[in-house]
Each structure stands twice: as C-alpha cells, then as structure tokens.
Amino acid sequence: MDISIKKHEHILKNEIFFIKTKWPHFDILFKGIKKIAKLSKNNKKVVILERTNLYGGISLFAPFFNLKNFISIDCITEKLKKRGAYNKKFLSSNKLIKIRSEHQYHYKKIKLKKSSADFIIIPNLLHHIDDPSILFKQVKRILKPNGFIFIFEPLVRELHQIPEDYSRFTPFGLTSTLKKFGFKNVSFEYSGGPFTCILYYWDQALQFIPKNLRKK
C-alpha cells in the first residue's frame, strides 16, 4: 500500500472513527474496503453510497480506489443539507487525501445505469435510510449480475444525526431482508459483545460530564 494511503488510513482510524477507543467494529469496515480495492483493480466498477455532506463533500474512502473506475455518491437529503458539514472539523490533517464525491443523489433516485456496477459499498448508511426497501431496489438495479455488495452497519449505537436515525439491523435481519430482494450467497461478520457494549455506553455517558471533571 502507498505510504500516503497508509497515513490517510491511520488518520481515519484514529482521529475520525476512533477504532482503538470507541468504535472497534469499524476495523471490519476497513478490512472490507481494502479487500474490495484489491478485487476491483482490473477495470471493475465500484460505487460507494455515503453521506459525504457531513464532511464538506469529501469521500473518506475514495483514496483506496482507482478513481477511473470509482464513483462516490453523496446520498443527500434536505435535512442533511440544513445541518451542513458539521464533521468537517475532523478533516484538518494534511495527511488526509481529500477527494470530493462526484454526485449528489437522494437514495430514492440514484441516476446510474442499470447493471453498471461490479461492487457497491454501503458504509454506515443504512440506519439513516427511512425506507431501506427502496434503497435495496436501487442497488439491485445498478448492480451487475454476479456483482457484489458490501454493507457495514452498527447494531449498537446511540441516537445520532437526529431525526434521520431510523433503524438497527441484526446480522440475521439484514441477511433475511437481502434474500427477499434476490441477493444470494449472503454472509456476515460481526465483532464485540456485552462488555464492548458496556464500554461504549460508558463512553457515551461521559459526554454528559464536563471535561474538567472526567478524570476526577
């Protein structure tokens, strides 16, 4: 891997997703992203559905791919537009590679051709979709026969990006839903357990304590 990409990944893991201290399950996301990046080198088309507006239109994962065969779509909504780029503050490091999303579409109207993508990545997005069935129909339409989708979703998470926080899928619920829409060979990986949940919610509780009192 290129040194600049390694630095980019390091910043994402440690200063945006905090995988060592807060969200360790995001390591699964990075493994999946890098695996698809390797598989897609031979002119395979990759589409990623994101909420890049939060970061000023910057795609966090575009640098991992060959941009000639990569499309980042900002799944924008009117509510998200009003909130603005409130996470852009995390992108101040000059070690980050900043590549903007090429397109902004509502998830119900993704303007890509039928059977045009070999891989579709949906990272940390599904719980912000009010009608997942429409999204899955869009994905099914865009994906080539024998194409591959990679979905990363949290099961345990506080309410966030309110009011656009709609649901949580278990691995089994998501598997069942995907099969209903005709997706085959569905598999999943998950991490964590009860102690991970306890630590996560303890971290959330600490946010309500003034910073000068937390160490005490």
Residue ranges and their predicted role:
Residues M1-K41:
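Class I SAM-dependent methyltransferase Rossmann-like catalytic core
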Residues K44, K114-S116, N146-G147:
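Surface-exposed loop/turn positions
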Residues V46, I120, I149:
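Receiver (REC) domain switch-region micro-motif
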Residues V47-K109:
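Class I SAM-dependent methyltransferase SAM/SAH-binding core
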Residues Y107-I120:
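A short acidic, Gly/Pro-enriched loop at the edge of an enzyme's catalytic core
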Residues D118-D130:
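A short SAM/SAH-binding and catalytic strip from SAM-dependent methyltransferases
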Residues D130-Q138, F148-K216:
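S-adenosyl-L-methionine-dependent methyltransferase catalytic module, highlighting the catalytic core
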